[in-house]
């Protein structure tokens, strides 16, 4: 084992794995530091909302220092992405320090709003009146900023940024779910299992399949057997869209509650129109999922920059003029790819959610299946990241000559 670790081609990946494990150890330790005892928490029947929080690294079963998870940070990234979408050139010219400060300041503001909402919705009224609510908010905000810092450090020195934290949070949430006796026939149960397996295969298809757009490369005109192409994934945004859409939905609910509570202290915490027990709440979430997924995918593809790169290099698409025509052609192709991928993901997530409205006695099992699907999707992305680091091994014969 020691000899294996000493080989350079594996050294980077092992260092990153160890760093990620250390980050996860701190995260697990933090989730076990309770601010309020379990007996002082309100019992909520909206189980999927708790599951949604866990998909951002949070936990509302107990009020701990990492209860908010990465939700405020993901929401701040969404807001900044939408602001910069209209002028990507200006965004690309910003320094890392400028982006960092904007993200952190916005995360701080959103953390305060979401902390206020979580305390009033999940902590008993007696405990809220007894404790210093501002001190509790300060602890939650501090824990959130610490978790954001850990996720940022993992992006630089670990593997897959915030995804391992979210994956551990989902696993923890799945283990805490109480699976009661299933009041359904064996045919229905078998059908659910088959649907989950089919869904996982579709997600694997979405993640691994890519769309290739051939173009003429002026540097390789002599190589007739080598074709140049521009490749995009069917869902360019990947699993980060699921976390961001849940974060935006949670912030929407907490933001509306925060504003209404300023004018009416006796406002209901439940807001049934924005829950997953309501078709309106599910529809709002799916619309957010599609819109954010589309904007994030277009942001990552960045067709405007791609058209500029083609204009500078002299490469072109057959039958398409350079410049504005190339940009319009790429925009058309990008819209087709993004909407197709997002439609598949939205249908996969949406059908089980709507299904719980018709068979509420199977809601726990359906939510468990949805969480399993999200877990597999995130695991695929983490595996892709690890495989990228392992590509170094393929160049060993060449690099050893110069090392």
From Swiss-Prot:
Membrane-spanning residues: 17-37, 63-83, 105-125, 131-151, 157-177, 186-206, 240-260, 276-296, 339-359, 366-386
Effect of inactivating the gene: No effect on cell growth, significantly reduces export of the cell wall protein SraP. The small amount that is exported seems to be glycosylated normally. A double secG/secY2 mutant enters stationary phase earlier and has significant differences in the export pattern of a number of extracellular proteins (shown in RN4220). Single or double deletions are as virulent as wild-type (shown in RN4220 and SH1000).
Domain of life: Bacteria
GO biological process terms on file: SRP-dependent cotranslational protein targeting to membrane, translocation
Alphabetized GO MF terms: protein transmembrane transporter activity; signal sequence binding
Bilayer topology annotation: Multi-pass membrane protein
Keywords: Cell membrane, Membrane, Protein transport, Translocation, Transmembrane, Transmembrane helix, Transport
Predominant location: membrane
Subcellular location: Cell membrane
InterPro entries: SecY/SEC61-alpha, SecY2, SecY_dom_sf
Gene3D superfamilies according to UniProt: SecY subunit domain
GO cellular component: cell envelope Sec protein transport complex; plasma membrane
Known function: The central subunit of a protein translocation channel (Potential). Part of the accessory SecA2/SecY2 system specifically required to export SraP, a serine-rich repeat cell wall protein encoded upstream in the same operon.
Family, as annotated: Belongs to the SecY/SEC61-alpha family. SecY2 subfamily.
Self-association state and partner proteins as the record states: May form heterotrimers with SecE and SecG subunits (Potential). Component of the accessory SecA2/SecY2 protein translocase complex required to export cell wall protein SrpA.
Name of the protein in its database record: Accessory Sec system protein translocase subunit SecY2
Organism: Staphylococcus aureus (strain NCTC 8325 / PS 47)
Lineage: Bacteria, Bacillati, Bacillota, Bacilli, Bacillales
């Amino acid at each position: 084992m020691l000899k294996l670790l000493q080989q350079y081609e594996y050294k980077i990946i092992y260092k990153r794995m160890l760093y990620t494990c250390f980050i996860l150890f701190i995260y697990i330790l933090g989730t076990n530091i309770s601010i309020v005892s379990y007996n002082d928490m309100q019992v909520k029947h909206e189980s999927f909302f708790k599951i949604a929080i866990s998909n951002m690294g949070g936990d509302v079963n107990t009020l701990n220092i990492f209860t908010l998870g990465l939700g405020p940070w993901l929401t701040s990234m969404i807001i900044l992405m939408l602001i910069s979408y209209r002028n990507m050139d200006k965004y690309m010219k910003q320094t890392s320090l400028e982006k960092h400060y904007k993200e952190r300041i916005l995360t701080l503001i959103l953390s305060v709003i979401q902390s206020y909402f979580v305390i009033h919705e999940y902590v008993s009224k007696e405990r809220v009146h007894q404790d210093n609510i501002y001190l509790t908010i300060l602890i939650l905000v501090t824990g959130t900023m610490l978790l954001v810092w850990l996720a940022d450090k993992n992006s630089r020195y670990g593997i897959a940024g915030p995804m391992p934290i979210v994956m551990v949070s989902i696993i923890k949430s799945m283990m805490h779910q109480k699976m009661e006796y299933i009041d359904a026939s064996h045919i229905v149960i078998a059908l659910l299992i088959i649907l989950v397996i089919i869904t996982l295969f579709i997600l694997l298809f979405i993640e691994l399949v890519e769309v290739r757009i051939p173009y003429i490369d002026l540097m390789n005109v002599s190589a007739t057997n080598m074709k140049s192409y521009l490749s995009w994934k069917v869902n360019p945004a990947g699993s980060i869209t699921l976390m961001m859409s849940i974060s935006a939905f949670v912030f929407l609910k907490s933001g509306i509650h925060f504003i209404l509570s300023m004018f009416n202290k006796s406002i209901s915490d439940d807001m049934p129109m924005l829950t997953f027990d309501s078709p309106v709440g599910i529809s709002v979430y799916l619309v957010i999922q599609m819109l954010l997924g589309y904007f994030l995918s277009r942001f990552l593809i960045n067709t405007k920059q791609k058209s500029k790169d083609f204009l500078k290099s002299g490469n072109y698409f057959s039958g398409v003029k350079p410049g504005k025509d190339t940009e319009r052609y790429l925009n058309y192709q990008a819209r087709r790819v993004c909407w197709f991928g997002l439609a598949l993901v939205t249908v996969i997530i949406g059908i089980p959610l709507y299904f719980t409205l018709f068979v509420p006695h199977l809601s726990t099992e359906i939510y468990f299946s949805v969480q399993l699907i999200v877990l597999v999707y995130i695991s695929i992305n983490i595996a892709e990241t690890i495989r990228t680091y392992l590509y170094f091994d393929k160049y060993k014969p060449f690099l050893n000559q110069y090392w």
